[in-house]
Curated annotation (Swiss-Prot):
It is found in: Cytoplasm, Cytoskeleton, Microtubule organizing center, Centrosome, Centriole. GO terms for cellular component: centriole; cytoplasm. Belongs to the LRRCC1 family. It comes from Mus musculus (Mouse). PROSITE patterns: LRR. Residues 170-212 form the LRRCT domain. InterPro entries: Leu-rich_rpt, LRR_dom_sf. Keywords: Cell cycle, Cell division, Coiled coil, Cytoplasm, Cytoskeleton, Leucine-rich repeat, Mitosis, Repeat. This is Leucine-rich repeat and coiled-coil domain-containing protein 1.
Length: 1026
């Protein structure tokens, strides 16, 4: 056996110029033991005892190097391999990454299952010069995020990084949030730990390297078993010719090999076709390999012809009795001779088919099928040429036989030779029939493979559609959540605006009450003035009638002054009580501050974040469950493959069972077609579901539009009521202006009457007393004026504070409007339905802004009213000053008026009559104004009650609509979850069916291979006996 292995190594060294070399599990201790050619493109040294990378400096064109499962502790000796694309150093003893500076074209690097804790060797690979895209570092000892990011930041083309796989990772993977940190600092990454940026698992199916397997069956038929170029069962390489017969072990020794060795060979062959060896650059190389294979086939045919001519013994060159050259037996013999090409082993081929089933891609399958179709006619031409050459050779042999028959005279052995020839003819006919059945079976297997690929395509399309539906559902939910947040914000703003409206109305009512109190005070002052005037008239009448009654009149005046003092004190007390009440009301009022607003916002945000986190956790749990199910399926598939490999040698059936298995496979095909129909119906149901969801969403949008229209209608009614209130306020102001004018006219007339009456006063003493009383009253009035000024200042301060508060609120509202505008700009990129909603929201915002402007105008009007009241107070002060001056003038003119008294007595009676008439008219107007004022107040109260009722009804409607929307959303979510569960069940059923089909095809293939082996063994034994 050792000699066989050595010969295989030498033969592989000799044939390394073809491009690929495989020395898997050969027990090599160093690469220097091999003689490698500089034109090699790929080397596979998996599962050896190599401890150092050396003796590959001269291989300039090397592109794929596999040194996995060795004892390498240091990366070195790769400085000259500038064309290297893939490097596999997994399952070694490496502790540090280094020596990769010269690998400019390196795209894939596998360093898994090592002892690496230092990645500083990746620093020289930074920049646009290097093309490293894939790094596998799982099952190592990397424990620093900073070091990892520092070494990988400059890898501009890095798209796939694996730090954890199948539960085996690095210490860095235990750090919380390491995935988010790596994705933020490495934006070029697309896949991290076999998951994309969104955390979804990615199936890492890569291109398989078995482009040349379609020619293996043809090589088995072309190379015969008795040629000196057979290949042993332990051979794995496909492109290497077999050693001579004297070097190979016997068939009995091969039969005696245990099952464990076969399993080991299978397991060792499976990783030889790892996906890391394949790139799209190998397509051209594979075509070159096909051409080389064609040349080798021609050489093999010529060698087999020469070997047949050389190996024909002289004893066999005897004529047949009653045989013809054109008979069926000779024709079958010639066909058999033309097909004598070195036989290939089936164990590695089976292993490669398993690997291709696991890692087969659609594009690759199409490419292989195209190659198969393009290469078949060329190989048929080769087959025809070889058959013609062999026929010519056989004719030469027959001529030699006839020449030898004349010389040879030994007829005793003719009967034995004839029997042997007949047996050979029968065996060749059986072989020809078996080959025809084998061709049919191979065609049928190709059809089954095509159907399986089509089913895989349908399955992948179903998965893609489900993923798209999930993405669409997630986007719709996200949009709904954003719209609900906007609606909540607008509702909060509406509530705030209503609260501000109520506050402004309360302030307006307070100002109106204050004005009423001032009017009442003025009325009381006027009454007092009327009483004073009546007392003065009485005094004048008493002076005219009786001069002696002056003392009594003085006493009466004193009593009246005492009453006035008491009234003034009462007024002071009332004013003080009202001031206290006003202050208490101001203190008890609750203003909506910025801190409270921010607290409410933070609470709402916390609630929404919690909801979002809960939803994310639920989706993550679902993803984990699906990943576990997928891993379980993979494990089951692997277990099934191992079981099938163990049963590989136990199956020994004949050609009769093939027909029954074909019938079963036909039934399975019919069953698969039914399943395909079911999957198509499933896809149709999913499309119907999507359409129903779209209709439901349109209905929801319509309901939202109706709600917005109702809001606009209510806002319009409120604006109409506010305009009516404005008109009434304007009418009240006009009436007040008329009232002030009438009061000014009455004051002028009363001053005239007061001057005329004072002329009657003759007595100086009485005037002195009156002056003293007037001075006292003047002091009291000045005190009252000072108190009124203080009140005015306090009102001004309160007004300023109210204006500041209003300005702050206006600024807050402006900031809110700016944020809303920004939200509008971000939402303009969405669908048409969302645009309609945004337009409605903009209309609502405009209405709110108009309301705010109206409120600001109302506040301005209130401020103007306060300014008017202040002006009125100033006018009253000026009038008081003018009256004081008039008093002084009256005192001076008193002496002159006494003389003119008798002449003006008649005028006084006429004036008194006119004054009475004016007073009656004024009182009538005042009554009418009061009645109108009461009516307006009642109307305002009714309007406020109606507004409150409308607000309550609108809120109820909004709550009912929101509850109905939430119930519909929950129903839709439940229905979607049910449909998704049904789809997953159907997908699982389809996968189980595909597994069954794969198992059946593998069993059929194994049966055929066993039968072909039995035929080959039988033919080889017959040849040995001959």
């Amino acid at each position: 056996m050792e000699a066989a292995v050595c010969s295989e190594i030498e033969r592989e060294d000799g044939d390394s110029s073809c491009g690929d070399v495989c020395f898997m599990d050969k027990g090599l201790h160093s690469i220097s033991e091999l003689s490698l050619d500089s034109s090699i493109h790929a080397i596979n040294l998996h599962c050896n005892n190599i401890s150092k990378i050396s003796s590959i400096d001269h291989i300039w064109n090397l592109r794929h190097l596999d040194l996995s499962s060795n004892q390498i502790s240091q990366i070195e000796g790769l400085n000259t391999l500038t064309k290297l694309c893939t490097l596999n150093l997994s399952c070694n003893l490496i502790t540090r990454v280094e020596g990769l500076e010269a690998l400019v074209n390196l795209t894939k690097l596998n360093l898994s299952y090592n002892h690496i804790n230092d990645l500083s060797g990746l620093m020289p690979l930074h920049g646009l010069k290097y093309k490293l895209r894939y790094i596998d570092l799982h099952s190592n000892y990397i424990d620093s995020i900073h070091h990892l990011l520092q070494c990988t930041v400059g890898l501009h083309f890095l798209t796939n990084l694996i730090l954890e796989k199948d539960g085996e990772g690095n210490p860095i993977c235990l750090i919380p949030g390491y995935r988010a940190i790596i994705l933020q600092t490495l934006p070029q990454l697309r896949i991290l730990d076999c998951k994309n940026i969104f955390g979804e698992p990615v199936s890492l199916e890569e291109i398989n390297s078995s482009h040349l397997q379609c020619l293996e069956g043809l090589l088995d038929n072309l190379v015969s078993s008795d040629s000196p170029l057979n290949i042993s069962e332990d051979e794995v390489n496909d492109d290497v010719p077999a050693p001579p017969m004297d070097v190979l072990p016997s068939l009995k020794e091969f039969k005696s090999t245990p099952e464990d060795n076969v399993l080991a060979s299978l397991l060792s062959v499976c990783p030889s076709s790892e996906p890391e060896k394949i790139n799209q650059e190998n397509d051209f190389q594979n075509e070159v390999k096909l051409q080389k294979l064609d040349d080798q086939i021609l050489q093999l045919l010529n060698e087999t012809n020469n070997s047949l001519i050389d190996n024909v013994p002289e004893k066999d060159l005897r004529p047949k009795r009653d045989t013809d050259i054109t008979s069926e037996s000779d024709y079958g013999n010639r066909r058999e001779c033309s097909r004598k090409v070195p036989r290939r082993t089936k164990i590695p081929y089976y292993a490669r088919t398993i690997q291709t089933i696991k890692h087969h891609n659609k594009n690759n399958g199409a490419f292989v099928s195209c190659n198969r179709k393009m290469r078949q006619p060329y190989l048929r031409d080769l087959y025809v040429r070889s058959s013609l050459v062999n026929c010519n050779n056989l004719r030469d042999l027959d001529e030699q036989k006839t020449g030898v028959i004349k010389v040879d005279k030994n007829f005793s052995d003719n009967s034995t030779y004839r029997s042997l020839v007949e047996q050979l003819d029968q065996e060749r006919e059986m072989r020809w029939k078996a080959e025809q059945t084998e061709k049919k079976l191979m065609d049928y297997i190709d059809e089954l493979h095509k159907q399986a690929d089509e089913k895989k395509d349908v399955h992948s399309q179903a998965l893609i559609t489900t993923d798209r539906l999930k993405d669409a559902i997630f986007k719709e939910r996200h949009c709904k959540a954003q719209l609900e947040i906007i609606v909540h914000r607008l509702q909060n703003e509406v509530k705030k605006l209503t609260i501000e409206l109520m506050k402004a109305r309360d302030q307006q009512e307070d100002h109106i009450r204050h004005l009423r109190t001032l009017e009442r005070a003025l009325e009381k002052m006027e009454k007092q003035k009327a009483q004073q005037q009546a007392a003065q008239i009485r005094l004048i009448q008493e002076v005219e009638l009786k001069a002696s009654a002056a003392d009594r009149e003085i006493n009466l005046l004193r009593t009246s002054l005492h009453q006035e003092k008491q009234q003034v004190q009462q007024l002071h007390e009332l004013l003080a009580l009202k001031e206290q009440e006003h202050r208490q009301e101001i203190e008890t009022r609750q203003f909506f501050t910025d801190a409270e607003f921010q607290d409410a916002l933070t609470k709402r945000l916390c609630k929404e974040e919690r909801k979002h986190e809960q939803e994310v956790k639920e989706y993550q749990e679902k993803i984990d469950i699906l990943n576990q199910q997928y891993l379980d399926l993979e494990n089951e598939f692997r277990i099934a493959l191992t079981v099938e490999a163990r049963r590989f040698k136990d199956v020994q059936d004949g050609f009769e069972d093939v027909a029954t298995e074909l019938a079963k496979s036909k039934h399975a095909l019919i069953w698969a077609q039914r399943k395909e129909n079911e999957s198509s119906s499933l896809i149709k149901d999913l499309t119907c579901m999507v359409k129903e969801q779209k209709t439901k969403l349109s209905e929801v949008c319509k309901l939202k539009q109706e709600a917005a229209a109702n809001l606009q209608n209510q806002i319009n009614t409120l604006e109409i009521l506010i305009e009516d209130d404005k008109q009434k306020s304007i009418q009240i102001e006009l009436l007040k202006h008329e009232k002030t004018q009438l009061i000014s006219e009455l004051a002028a007339k009363e001053s005239l009457i007061y001057g005329l009456r004072t002329e009657r006063k003759v007595w100086g003493q009485e005037l002195a007393c009156q002056s003293s009383t007037l001075s006292q009253s003047r002091g009291k009035l000045e005190a009252q004026i000072e108190s009124l000024c203080r009140e005015n200042e306090s009102l001004r301060k309160s007004h300023e504070s109210d204006c500041d508060a209003l300005r702050i609120k206006c600024k807050i509202i402006e900031d809110q409007n700016e944020t809303i505008r920004k939200l509008k700009d971000s939402l303009q990129e969405k669908d048409g339905q969302i645009k309609l909603l945004q337009e409605q929201i903009a209309l609502i915002e405009k209405c709110s802004q108009e309301q705010l402007n109206e409120k600001s105008s109302q506040l301005d009007s209130i401020v103007e009213k306060l300014e008017r009241h202040n002006e009125r107070k100033e006018k009253l002060k000026q009038q008081l000053k003018a009256k004081e001056l008039e008093l002084e003038e009256i005192r001076k003119a008193y002496s002159t008026l006494n003389k003119k008294w008798h002449d003006k007595g008649e005028l006084l009676s006429h004036l008194e009559m006119q004054v009475k008439e004016v007073k009656e008219k004024f009182e009538d107007k005042e009554r009418k104004l009061k009645a109108e004022r009461d009516k307006s107040l009642e109307l305002q109260k009714d309007a406020m009650e109606k507004l409150q009722n409308m607000d309550d009804a609108f809120r109820r409607q909004v709550d009912e609509i929101v509850e109905a929307h939430q119930a519909e959303i929950m129903q839709l979510a439940n229905e979607k979850q049910k449909y998704i569960d049904c789809a997953n069940l159907k997908v699982q059923q389809v996968e189980d069916e595909m597994r069954g089909l794969l198992d059946e095809t593998c069993k059929n293939k194994k049966m055929m291979e066993e039968k072909i082996k039995q035929l080959a063994c039988a033919i080889s034994e017959i040849q040995k006996e001959m």
